[in-house]
Regions:
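The feature marks the mature, well-folded catalytic cores of soluble enzymes
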Residues: 32-376
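N-terminal export signals
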Residues: 6-28
Length: 376
């Protein structure tokens, strides 16, 4: 079964060339890559102008689950559109299909080429500054370390940036993905070393060098590093499956309570770090935990599939709502709903069945354009 946490063998065939050469870029120095310090990546909970979704599932990757993946994306799209505008990127020949599945209320469609559905990883990282200007950062998507063909997806960040008003998006010297970035919008980030300090993306880079570049690109003053784990999923343990900022000083973390899961030890280690960490302003973090369901519903997506990754951390915060998953485990689903409702009291928690994409999740298949413009 092809899920996000599976190494997709039939399409992982980019090899034999240097990383920079394969991307068609030069890995220029930190000074050239750095954004002006006033630029920052907003917290997801700040007002959004619109959300994004990439309707890019194809049978070469998803096989017999393609229609199910599209249907799951449709549920996500329609839920978002109840609260704010949504743009769906889609292929020209699937434009009508995308609208039939994702709807027309509050949804616009932009035709472009795509390899897959993971818009969080392949899209532009939109930044803002104190003057109200909009910028964007492109982290040179390389298929999570050349594990999947990605030539079309690699072009989406620059395409989306220009489409929404950023004539010259900044291209980082780093290779990485949006799902590997978590920020509070006030100078603190959480990242996993397994994703960023990895030779399949950034060969020869030390953690210190990676940190300097991320700080410069995203307007960060401090990064809290979690170890993650390399090689167990296609992303090398993106942070958006492990820890999320609710607001500055408050974090919700994934805590796997199943001793048989490799994530049991990983999440315990992460929790220990987060409980003693301080943010850029010196505050000790208030840490809440959400545990994956121990009894998710039996389905053809989860059956005999050790890579099925059911977790509640991968939710998407939008204007007025939190779009979150449910997995058919009444106790765990209710616990997730209750905690998220308490953490986001001004937002409605909307839980959706997304089993077909639960090797990734709702956060992985969405991204956002922040509200920008100089305040009155």
């Amino acid at each position: 079964m092809a899920t996000r946490r599976t190494f997709i063998k039939q399409l992982s065939a980019v090899a034999g060339v240097g990383l920079a050469a394969s991307l068609g870029i030069s890995l220029h120095g930190h000074a050239k890559a750095a954004l002006n310090p006033v630029w920052r990546l907003p917290d997801e909970g700040e007002p959004q102008q619109r959300a994004f979704l990439a309707f890019g599932a194809q049978r070469a990757i998803w096989g017999g689950f393609t229609a199910d993946v599209q249907a799951a994306q449709g549920r996500i799209a329609r839920a978002i559109a109840e609260f704010q505008p949504l743009t769906v990127f889609c292929r020209a020949h699937e434009r009508q299909l995308a609208e039939a599945i994702c709807g027309s209320h509050n949804v616009s469609y932009v035709v472009t080429e795509l390899d897959d559905i993971w818009v969080r990883d392949i899209g532009a990282n939109f930044v803002v500054n104190d003057a109200g200007a909009l910028g964007a950062v492109d982290f040179n998507f390389n298929g999570w370390g050349n594990k999947q063909r990605h030539a079309k997806d690699a072009r989406l960040a620059a395409f989306a940036a220009k489409k929404y008003g950023v004539a010259q998006p900044r291209r980082s010297a780093l290779v990485g993905e949006g799902g590997g970035i978590e920020v509070d919008g006030h100078g603190t980030g959480i990242m996993t070393e397994s994703c960023w300090v990895n030779a399949n993306r950034n060969p020869g880079w030390s953690r210190e060098r990676v940190e300097r570049e991320l700080k410069a690109m995203l307007g960060l003053r401090k990064i809290i590093w979690l170890p993650g784990i390399k090689g167990r999923d296609i992303t090398d343990a993106h942070v958006d499956f492990y820890a999320r900022f609710v607001r500055p000083g408050v974090v919700v973390a994934n805590l796997d309570t199943d001793p048989a899961s490799y994530d049991h030890a990983v999440t315990q280690a992460h929790l220990a770090i987060l409980k003693t960490a301080t943010d850029a302003d010196g505050r000790t973090l208030q840490v809440h935990t959400l545990s994956p369901p121990l009894a998710p519903r039996d389905s053809r997506f989860s059956r005999r599939n050790p890579d099925f990754a059911a977790g509640y951390i991968n939710y998407f915060v939008i204007n007025g709502a939190v779009i979150a998953p449910e997995f058919g485990d009444p106790q765990a689903d209710k616990a997730a709903f209750t905690l998220l409702s308490a953490l986001y009291p001004q937002r409605k928690v909307v839980q959706l069945e997304i089993d077909a994409i639960a090797g990734g999740g709702i956060h992985c298949v969405t991204s956002q354009l922040p509200v920008h413009g100089k305040p009155e």
